[in-house]
């Protein structure tokens, strides 16, 4: 009797794909896990698995275990060189002026499309008194209509509204097709904040729909920043938001918009890829925000087959520093690319509360 062989269905193909990815990770893990990180990178003493979500949080770092870290604003990028004891002592003297603590809250049982809210308390001497307690919501890499669908988008909007942020910042890679631009930003426009909504473009947005995205954002009262800066004012004081245009085109955009700013201002740099703050000088920046990496999207024991960064795991997720010790927060983002799968890289939104350092 001849046996009939049926093609795999969607229900069976995803486990097969996931198994193949895990095998790929195991083949690459030795090389990735022994790679040394460039100096200086600050580490926490311990990293613990996030067990709040059995799938999305598998093997992911638990941000609630992060300890307070101290760094400083540095006005110049330094040429990479071999580390010496003198260099290390100099670096230690610079680690003051900023304190950063972090925690995370699992929301996957209440909201679809987002697994957790990661909260940072960012204390810095240049934060104006009027901005004490100022709340920043940061999202990136929605890739709308990949893993994130209409219900997830509506839940994301509800979650953002619940954060009661003073400003919403967005890191790019918004869509998986131009037909999704208007419904995406129409939904995000329901998030009302006192200081408005700002966004930069990601590589996907430059490949397609760029003008449509820019015009749609403006239509809904949002501000796209393409190598531009804007000033947020409150009670006679101010902070600066700077946005980078296509950070992959360094020939055109290799001069950071922060270079023309005053060192006295508190400056937040919004850029799609974290590599930019290491590739070029971003002097005068107090805090950089980036996405692009998806946190690895599929990570097992901290190792991912695709890192989306030239610097490996150094700029994969969470809190990091460039060589000039400028702090950078990298979000896992929300959507996915290539495959609608996340393992060990929970979809997240970031909420940062600013505090003024008093000595």
Listing of model-derived features with the role each one plays in the protein:
Residues 15-24:
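Bacterial N-terminal signal peptides
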Residues 27-135:
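Acidic, histidine-bearing metal-coordination/catalytic regions of metal-dependent phosphoesterases
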Residues 97-98, 104-109, 121-123, 186-250, ...:
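Extended active-site neighborhood of metal-dependent phosphoesterases/phosphodiesterases
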Residues 113-115, 127-215, 219-223:
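Membrane-embedded segments
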Residues 115, 123-137, 222-223, 230-243, ...:
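Beta-strand-turn-beta hairpins that frame and shape the catalytic cleft
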Residues 139-140, 167-173, 196-203, 225-228, ...:
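Active-site neighborhood of phospho(di)ester-bond hydrolases with catalytic His/Asp-centered motifs
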Residues 189, 274-353, 357-359:
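Conserved beta-sheet core of the metallophosphoesterase superfamily
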Residues 257-270:
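Short beta-strand/loop segments at the ligand-binding rim of alpha/beta enzyme cores
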């Amino acid at each position: 009797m001849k046996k009939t062989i049926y093609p795999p269905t969607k229900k069976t193909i995803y486990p097969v794909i996931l198994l193949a990815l895990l095998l790929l990770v195991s083949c690459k893990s030795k090389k990735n896990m022994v790679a040394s990180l460039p100096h200086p990178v600050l580490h926490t003493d311990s990293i613990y698995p996030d067990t709040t979500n059995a799938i999305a949080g598998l093997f992911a770092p638990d941000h609630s275990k992060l300890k307070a870290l101290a760094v400083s604003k540095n006005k110049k990028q330094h040429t990479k060189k071999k580390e010496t004891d003198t260099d290390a002592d100099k670096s230690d003297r610079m680690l003051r002026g900023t304190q950063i603590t972090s925690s995370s809250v699992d929301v996957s049982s209440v909201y679809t499309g987002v697994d957790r809210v990661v909260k940072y308390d960012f204390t810095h001497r240049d934060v104006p008194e009027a901005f004490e307690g100022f709340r920043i919501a940061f999202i990136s890499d929605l890739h709308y209509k990949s893993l994130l669908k209409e219900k997830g988008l509506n839940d994301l909007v509800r979650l953002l509204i619940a954060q009661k942020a003073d400003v919403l910042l967005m890191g790019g890679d918004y869509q998986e097709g131009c037909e999704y631009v208007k419904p995406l930003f129409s939904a995000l426009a329901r998030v009302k904040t006192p200081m408005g909504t700002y966004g930069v473009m990601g590589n996907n947005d430059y490949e397609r729909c760029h003008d449509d995205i820019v015009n749609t954002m403006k239509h809904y009262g949002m501000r796209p920043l393409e190598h531009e800066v804007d000033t947020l004012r409150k009670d006679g004081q101010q902070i600066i938001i700077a946005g980078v245009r296509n950070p992959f085109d360094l020939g055109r955009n290799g001069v950071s918009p922060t270079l023309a700013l005053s060192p006295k201002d508190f400056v937040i740099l919004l850029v799609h890829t974290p590599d930019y703050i290491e590739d070029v000088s971003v002097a005068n920046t107090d805090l950089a925000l980036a996405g692009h990496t998806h946190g690895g999207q599929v990570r097992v024991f901290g190792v991912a087959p695709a890192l989306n960064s030239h610097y490996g795991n150094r700029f994969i997720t969470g809190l990091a520093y460039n060589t000039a010790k400028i702090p950078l927060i990298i979000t896992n983002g929300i959507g996915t690319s290539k495959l609608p799968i996340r393992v060990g890289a929970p979809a997240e939104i970031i909420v940062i509360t600013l505090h003024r350092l008093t000595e």
